[in-house]
Amino acid sequence: LPPGISINPSNGDIYGTTDEVGASTFTVTVSGSNAAGDIRTASKTYLIKISDPDSFPYKVDFTLSGYSGSSTLSQFPVLVTFDSGISGFSYNSFASATAGDLRFYAANGEELPYEIETWDTTGVSRIWVRVGSVSGTNTVITAAWGDSSKTTAPDYVFDGSTWSNGYHAAWHFQNMSGVLTTDSTANNRHLTAEGGATTGTGQVGN
């Protein structure tokens, strides 16, 4: 467990306060015996994640108002766009020129995995954020940045975590390298172009 966090061995409650941010694992092992005296032991490993959005000096809230369905979307990637016209946003306030200090958080403080599709400090940047729960038109997520101690992007930015909820592949066609379009999931299902390309209007961009 992180420093300052303890587990009550009698009831399993986790309690305490810590300044350590990040993910850690711990294993709980329980042993007991039945009426015949047979001893049984079981173990389970847990992952605990601690985040601190308040460590970032710059934040912008985004309300996901475009979904009007009646069901709740779980672990759903949503598109967030940045540009200089957003109130409270400036590329110059980032501690990393490549947005290594960018983080996203749910309303409950959970850190959300994301993928940068394009990062353009002179124009519009496009980021896909995997939101744990999207319900109605008032789900709020927070973008945070500017912490000079967190300028290295987390692994989830690059490892396909954004698209891990059953997606077979995810392609951003403007990121074509020659004739190759890379798959953003961890499945590595890259595309090779055959013939010429034609740009058309899509559900999200062209």
Predicted features along the sequence, with ranges:
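Extracytoplasmic low-complexity segments
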Residues: 149-206
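Surface-exposed beta-strand/loop patches in extracellular or lumenal glycoproteins
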Residues: 70-95
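A surface-exposed beta-strand-loop module
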Residues: 111-141, 149
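Extracellular and select intracellular beta-sandwich modules with Ser/Thr-enriched
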Residues: 38-46
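Short, solvent-exposed loop/turn segments at the edges of extracellular beta-sandwich modules
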Residues: 31-39
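Strand-loop-strand motifs at the edges of beta-sheets in extracellular beta-sandwich domains
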Residues: 2-19, 27, 123-126
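Interdomain boundary/hinge segments at the C-termini of tandem beta-sandwich modules
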Residues: 46-52
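Boundary/junction segments of secreted and surface-exposed precursor proteins
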Residues: 52-74
